[in-house]
Structures are given as C-alpha cells and as structure tokens.
Amino acid sequence: MTAHLADILVYTLLGFAVLYPFFFWFTPRQKIDSGFYNFNLGLVGLIGGMALILTWATEMERTHVFGIAGWLGLHLLVTYLCWNSEKISIMVISFAAFVGCVIFMVLAIDIIPAGNSYLIIFTGFVSQAILAGVIFAMILGHWYLNVIQLPIVLLRKTANALAFLLVIRLIWNLIQFKSLVVIDQYGKTLTAYQYITTLDGFFLGVAVFFGLL
C-alpha cells in the first residue's frame, strides 16, 4: 500500500514538474516581468526535488533516481541562467522540460506495467498537463492583481489551452467509460451507462456527473 502511494506521488509530482514549463509559451518574457519566471521556475525545481527525494527514500529503481536527478540538475542550471535575466529563451526551458518528459514516460510505463504503453503515456500527459495548466493559470491570475496593465491576452491563451486539454480529457473519459461493463447482482451484464440508471448505480452516476462533466 505504501509503495503504491509513493508511486502515485512520484508520478504526480514529476508529471506536473516536467509539463509545467511548457506553459511559458503563453507568457513571453517581453510581456511579463522576470519575477514571474523566477517564481515558476523555482516552483518546478521544488516539486521536482520532492519527486526526487520520494524516489530515493522509497528505494525505487536507481535508473529512475538517476534520471530524475539528471533532469532536475538540468532544470536548476537553466533556472540559474534565467534568473532575473532580461533575455529568457523559452526554447532552452522547453528542452529541459522535454528531457523530463522522457524520464516521466519511462517512469509511467514502469509503475503501470499492465496496459498499452501508448495509452498510459497519453493519459498521463493529458492529466498532468491539466494539473499543471490549472496551477499555472491560477498563479498567472494572481499576477494580474500585482502588475498594472498586464496584457489580458496572456491569461486568455492559457485558459484556451487549458480548455482544449479539458475537452480532450472529457472525450477520452467518456470513450473509456463506454467500454466499461458491470455485472449486477442478478448476473446481468450492463454497460456503464445502463448501470448508472439503476438504483445500485446511482452513486456512480453522481461521481460521473461531478468527475467527468
């Protein structure tokens, strides 16, 4: 139980940390102050550090420990070079994030061995990108409270990207839910949609409504 919890935490923390920097594409340095980059790059380093500590403390495979450590070292180097800089290359930040994505894919396939690797990677990237997008949009929204005349287009682009990811996730969830079958107490096989219309499936229907829709 503890091992599975650690896997979930590492999976979530690492996925968030490696996908978060890609949202910088919606906030170019020319339109926002360096403090925004400092804070968010530092946040990624902190979350990535937590993933590394958990990986090491729970004695996961050394390849994962070294992989996360290598990515984190690269990210911290990029953070050092970009700190308070007037010329920040989003390409460089994205390269470090791409390296992290490769590490994340290897980790995801290893801790979720049962199933199609492509589906695992797709689901993981979409889910973690949504989490990263929500936090990024929240921080960006708070930035508007402290910075005068910050272009609203930055938040609009971020919100549009997040909405796009949410639509993809919703469609994917509905497709997966449609393929689910349930055998009721009478031995009758029902589709998930049929099951939630029964009295026994009422609470599942509530969960679907709030969780998917």
Residue ranges of predicted features:
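Helix-coil boundary and interhelical linker segments in multi-pass alpha-helical membrane proteins
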Residues: 1-4, 109-119
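Hydrophobic cores of alpha-helical transmembrane segments in multi-pass integral membrane proteins
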Residues: 3-109, 124-143, 160-178, 182, ...
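Alpha-helix capping and helix-coil boundary motifs
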Residues: 33, 117-120, 187
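A cytosolic-side transmembrane-helix exit/cap motif
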Residues: 59, 113-117, 145-146
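Non-transmembrane, amphipathic alpha-helical segments
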Residues: 117-123, 127, 153
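Hydrophobic, small-residue-rich membrane helices and short re-entrant helix-turn-helix hairpins
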Residues: 146-159
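Peri-membrane helix termini and adjoining interfacial loops of integral membrane proteins
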Residues: 181-189
